[in-house]
Amino acid sequence: MEIAQALILGIVQGLTEWLPISSSGHLVLLQIILLSRSSAAFIALVHAGTLLAVIVAFRRDVFNVIKSFLEGISELPKGSAFSSPERKLPLYILIGTVPVAVLGLALAKYVDEIFGSSKIVGVGLLITAALLYSTKWAGGERPLDLRRALIVGLAQSIAIFPGISRSGATISTALLSGLKREEAIRYSFLLSIPALTGFLILELIVSPAHEILNPEGLVGLLSSFITGLIAIKFLLSIIRRGRLHLFSYYCVIVGIAILSLL
């Protein structure tokens, strides 16, 4: 892989991981167009960039979640460990992560078939479009609870399939469940951290060290980190203005084009 290709793939990963248009789908398409299949190490590094981006963007929330979890653990002997909403959030994140972990392990041996199909990408983008468009009528003032945490976690699990946007699926589902807009944003982004971390660890385990420590990988990591931060800031402004559904038009156009041409 050349530096220019690494830069392009890193930028695409950074933008599409957080914009609700499916990063996995666009990476699959780019690899088909560039006739170059990225190594597991490179994919891990660009995901590391987007993971760092969300941690930096939500650093206060990440700190508070860790703090609440540790405080909850320390309060276990007193019986009031996870009684407050802030103390419950770490548990909701763990519970919401279970579906994607289970489905990911179940589909591990089918990775090549799933990520080698442009048709799956096309169908996935149409599903994403439907979810995004439905947010025109979504919204509410309900708090996060166990049921909604699990429902959003299930939505995250289907984003394993290329073409289905993780952020699009989780934020749309959170809004459709009646969550407050800021609550939906916060939970969706915090929920992504364990999933991305798990994926990153699995990819690094099977990656030779020489494939990780190279200029192309560094370019991919830095470009995905920088563009990831930009994408998060842009997406937050779109959601807060109630315009998440606008991304559905792009997903429909690209999804139909893929199914028609590839």
Swiss-Prot record:
Subcellular localization: Cell membrane
Protein name as annotated: Undecaprenyl-diphosphatase
Enzyme class: hydrolase
Membrane topology: Multi-pass membrane protein
Domain of life: Archaea
GO BP term (any one): peptidoglycan metabolic process
Functional note: Catalyzes the dephosphorylation of undecaprenyl diphosphate (UPP).
Keyword line: Cell membrane, Hydrolase, Membrane, Transmembrane, Transmembrane helix
Molecular function via GO: undecaprenyl-diphosphatase activity
Origin species: Korarchaeum cryptofilum (strain OPF8)
Secretion signal span: none
Reactions accelerated catalytically: di-trans,octa-cis-undecaprenyl diphosphate + H2O = di-trans,octa-cis-undecaprenyl phosphate + phosphate + H(+)
Membrane-traversing stretches: 15-35, 38-58, 91-111, 114-134, 149-169, 189-209, 219-239, 242-262
Family affiliation: Belongs to the UppP family.
EC number, UniProt record: 3.6.1.27
Family matches, as InterPro entries: UppP
GO cellular component: plasma membrane
PANTHER family listed in its UniProt record: UNDECAPRENYL-DIPHOSPHATASE (PTHR30622:SF2)
